[in-house]
Each structure stands twice: as structure tokens, then as C-alpha cells.
């Protein structure tokens, strides 16, 4: 699980049936306090939280847990956006996003 920033949309001419109606995004891991990039962007499915480009989100990056969030055990998914982050508190520092 990591905090990331939605940096783009992903489009496909064909989708697996379990992904119909779901939005796909590129999410780059970030340090939640400094907002500095912490890795390469990955594709993640919006788990119904209403994320969009520029959103700071919480990503479940483990296939079985991601499929559980989507309630579809056969979905070909590794990462799902499970929350939009409002704020992070770490080491006495509070970072607000909303």
C-alpha cells in the first residue's frame, strides 16, 4: 500500500469484462509529507472513490487485496485506488491535501 499522485489517464480499446465502467489511471508513488516522487508510475483501477488527475490517493498494490476491494476474484488487477487522501500526519507534521 502506498500514497501516490494520479498523474494521468489510461485508455484501452478493449478491456477485460470485469473492468468495464471502471476508470484506469497512472499513479506515481510520492512521499506523503514532501510530495517528492518515490518511484515509477503504475496503472491502477479507481475502486469507486472518484479519483482523477492531480488527486493524492491511497493505492492497494497487491493483487488479491485489490480484487477483494473490487469484489471480483477473477479481475486481472494488481493495483486499485482505495481512497482519496485528505491529510497525512507523520512525525508531528500535518500535510493537508483537501
Task: Specify the residue positions occupied by each region the protein language model found.
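Structural detector for short beta-strands of small beta-barrel domains
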Residues: 1-13, 83-85
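Short, structured beta-strand/loop micro-motifs enriched in basic residues and often containing a Trp
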Residues: 35-43
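Short N-terminal binding/cap micro-motifs at the start of the first secondary-structure element
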Residues: 12-17, 35-36
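C-terminal structural segments of small proteins and small subunits
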Residues: 58-60, 64-98
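Histidine- and aromatic-rich ligand-binding microenvironments
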Residues: 43-48, 60
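Short aromatic-glycine-enriched beta-strand elements
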Residues: 18-27
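Short, surface-exposed secondary-structure edge patches
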Residues: 16, 46-50, 72-73
Amino acid at each position: 500500500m502506498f500514497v501516490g499522485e494520479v498523474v494521468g489517464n489510461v485508455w484501452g480499446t478493449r478491456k477485460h469484462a470485469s473492468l468495464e465502467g471502471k476508470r484506469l489511471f497512472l499513479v506515481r508513488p510520492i512521499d506523503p509529507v514532501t510530495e517528492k516522487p518515490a518511484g515509477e508510475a503504475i496503472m491502477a483501477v479507481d475502486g469507486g472513490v472518484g479519483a482523477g488527475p492531480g488527486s493524492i490517493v491511497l493505492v492497494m498494490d497487491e493483487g488479491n487485496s485489490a480484487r477483494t476491494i473490487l469484489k471480483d476474484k477473477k479481475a486481472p488487477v494488481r493495483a486499485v485506488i482505495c481512497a482519496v487522501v485528505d491529510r497525512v500526519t507523520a512525525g508531528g507534521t500535518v500535510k493537508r491535501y483537501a
